[in-house]
Regions:
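Sec-dependent bacterial lipoprotein signal peptides
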Residues: 1-17
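Acidic, polar-rich low-complexity tracts and alpha-helical solenoid repeat scaffolds
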Residues: 16-179
Length: 179
């Protein structure tokens, strides 16, 4: 009798929690859709904070859900895009700590480095990019991380001049590999 009562209680809790999860997912989807329809609002820090709150709230409530790390990654990206670097890094660090087996963990490390870079925190960016490149040398973003490292702290004009100055060398090297 006790087992049946426990099973019934578990079933009730499962059913009670499921709509909450679905409701939360619907709220996230609706918010994301509104932002997609109005890209200007996506750059608004208040809008970014609201969306981040939804993502983080989902991860808090459903930490074992496979979408929890996905939403944390999105939350970190959103905060990074509005230059809330400290908050972005906190979220990325939480993701790294809580979900070490997350399939997109390398992207989390890259985005963390990029958040520092975008906020002109070059020492932190350098360390984070170097970590990423050494840990994930074959990741599709490794080349971008190396380019960012090579141009860390440069103005856009300086970066362009450096890239153009080395463009001929790159083309010659690529052509010699073909021969």
């Amino acid at each position: 009798m006790r087992k049946i009562a426990l099973l019934a209680l578990a079933a009730i809790l499962f059913v009670a929690c499921s709509p909450n999860r679905e409701k939360h997912l619907e709220q996230i989807a609706a918010f994301e859709e509104r932002i997609t329809e109005s890209p200007i609002s996506a750059a608004n820090p208040e809008t970014a904070d609201s969306l981040t709150d939804l993502y983080v709230s989902f991860a808090d409530k459903f930490e074992k859900d496979s979408l929890a790390p996905v939403f944390l990654l999105k939350a970190g990206e959103v905060q990074s895009n509005v230059l809330h670097t400290e908050h972005a890094v906190e979220i990325f660090d939480r993701l790294i700590e809580d979900y070490p087996d997350f399939e997109d963990l390398p992207m989390c490390y890259y985005l963390k480095a990029n958040a520092y870079d975008m906020n002109s925190q070059y020492e932190e960016a350098k360390a984070a990019y170097e970590f990423f490149v050494s840990k994930y040398p074959n990741h599709f973003m490794a080349r971008a991380a190396q380019v960012s490292l090579d141009h860390l702290g440069m103005s856009p004009e300086e970066m362009l001049a450096d890239i153009l100055a080395h463009a001929d060398d790159t083309i010659i090297a690529q052509n010699s590999e073909m021969i």
